[in-house]
Amino acid sequence: MIVDRYYYHQLNKKEQAIYKAFYNGVMAYQEIIPIPVSGEFTHNSFEHIFMALTRDNPLIYFLNQSACSIAHDIFGHIAICPQYFFSKEKIKEYSRKIEKVVNELAGKLHLLECSDYEKELRVHDWICQNVAYDYEGTDKDKVSRVIASHNILGVFAYHKAQCEGIAKAVKVLLNAVDVKCIVVTGTAGKDGNMGPHAWNIVNIDGEPYHLDATWDISLPESMRITYDYFNLTDDLMNLEHNPENVLPKCNKGSANYFIKNRCDFQTRYTLLKYIQAQIEHGKKELLFLSLIHISEPTRLRRI
């Protein structure tokens, strides 16, 4: 397992000190966490550090951001007063169960016996085959459902989550087998209909790539695994995704699923030749990347 804290390293020294104190405090389930800062500490600063902490550490799934507060005393001391979704005993119980599930998956998928690319592929495929998108995960009348859906509990306990929970689970699984992975937040959408979204940047053979497992999840009845958003470059990803933070540049394409499997095509001749050969071999469904005579790449064509 690796400790992979990308957002911590984007903070200044003062923010990093607060991040560390906050992390140590919540891992000890403290109700009042003194922080090493004097002077002004705004709610915006707190939110910035909170987001860095929870994206770097998806195993901190039990914090209620909207209910956390900042306390000041007459001597100028400042403390964070966190609110936890669950009791200390429940958090320990859930954390043990999550650790067990992650370890069992690492063994079942043989994640310690393969390349980083193969680890990512197997985690992606497991998510796509075993996790459904939770369309009720924003229903305010179902508070426990919302809590689970937006963190790793949704994936590991209920096999149903929204994009944030899925992206965090991907990071937990990949970090557990020594693959660097970032949770990315921003907006995404098609045809101009943008909304909040979360996905990942995964480091494969020293190069970062975008991975959106949520958008690769098919409808339950199709039972397909798709690879539309498996290891994309910035140019491809930014057609429909807008990250809100400064991120590593994703400029290499060699670990893209279609390029890796030699089913990416830039001429009509090579594409038609590929289709003909696959049909002759009895294939009824083809997945490929086409970059032919179009201004915006078409990631997937099914035949």
Predicted regions: what they are:
Residues M1-E104, R299:
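Linear, non-domain "peripheral" regions
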Residues G165-D235:
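Hydrophobic/aromatic-rich core segments of domains that either
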Residues V123, Y158, C163-G165, A169, ...:
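Gram-positive cell-envelope targeting signals
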Residues I292-I303:
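Single conserved hydrophobic/aromatic residue that forms the stacking wall/gate
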Residues G25-G39, Q276-L291:
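Short glycine-rich, basic-tinged beta-strand/loop micro-motifs
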Residues S87-V155:
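Secondary-structure boundary elements
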Residues H241-I275, I279:
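Charged, amphipathic alpha-helical linkers/stalks
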Residues Y117, V146, K160-E164, K168, ...:
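Conserved structured core elements
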